[in-house]
Design a protein with these regions (language model features):
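PLP-dependent aminotransferase class I/II
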Residues: 1-135
Length: 135
């Protein structure tokens, strides 16, 4: 179990180190008081359109990234209750803009490098920025 956890942390750190220079992506913040269990690696895109374009771009290059979750206040369960639910714009921002990248034990360093190269390529290649909205 320790070796599995250690490898996941190494993969997480590879992502973090390789993606730090992309100003359009917000990377995870690990407070000084916390520890990293490396269960997932994610980034937050500037807009929902950007996230959709990034996921589509990565898929076209053989990388399967996914969105993370639906805000609980917008889930069918909550919608079907008689509760008065307020708007939660920060939760919605993460629902709409967060993307998770592959992170599993069998992932090899050269694969992580390739994924990071594709993410960088998305942000550095010439593309029609209108295709994913305003920054």
């Amino acid at each position: 179990l320790d070796s599995i956890q250690q490898k996941r942390k190494e993969i997480w750190n590879m992502y973090y180190q390789n993606l730090q220079g992309i100003s359009s992506l917000s990377l995870p913040v690990l407070p000084d008081y916390a520890t990293n269990n490396a269960h997932a690696f994610y980034a937050v895109c500037a807009t929902p359109e950007e996230r959709t374009a990034l996921i589509r771009y990565l898929k076209s290059h053989g990388v399967y990234s996914v969105f993370h979750y639906l805000s609980l206040h917008k889930s069918d369960f909550v919608k079907n209750q008689k509760w008065e639910v307020e708007e939660l714009p920060q939760a919605d921002k993460y629902t709409d803009c967060l993307v998770r990248f592959p992170l599993f034990y069998a992932l090899e360093p050269d694969e992580v490098k390739y994924i990071c190269e594709q993410i960088k390529s998305f942000y550095t290649s010439e593309r029609d920025e209108a295709s994913f909205g305003e920054r």
